[in-house]
Amino acid sequence: MCVRYLLSNSYVLEGDILLHNPKIIQKYQYQSNYCGIKVDRTDDWCLFENKGRVTGYAVGGENCHQIMGITYWTEEDGKKLGEYIKKVYEMPGGKERYWDQVALQYYIDDFDIAIRECSFDDFIEIDTFNELKAIDKSYDV
């Protein structure tokens, strides 16, 4: 079975995230959302919002929310996202797109995505093998 059929009422976590705060994963979510940290400036992926609704994203920005790699999708939005992923994949150049671009760029007007506030203490992003070894000594061989 293809993962795009499993997005309804589901969390999606990027593979390089180590979750420190288990309360980020909650039994009930009532709106699709991205976990984000309010920052004055970032060179990382970030979200822009208006009145609690995500209105855009970019690599780098000011007065934005830095994306932390954890999202939640409602039943309705998960179904739409699954369908739209297939459509974007079939577009010219679609195979080179990130899955996030589907809801945040190509079909942003079809989603009502909120930002869930979190902090840098809630996660660790592991970008290098050395960072992984610092966290898990079993890799230090």
What are the residue ranges of the model-derived segments?
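Short phosphate-binding loop-to-helix
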Residues: 1-9
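Conserved core of the sugar-phosphate nucleotidyltransferase
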Residues: 20-93
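Conserved alpha/beta core of the MobA/IspD/sugar-nucleotide pyrophosphorylase nucleotidyltransferase superfamily
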Residues: 67-141
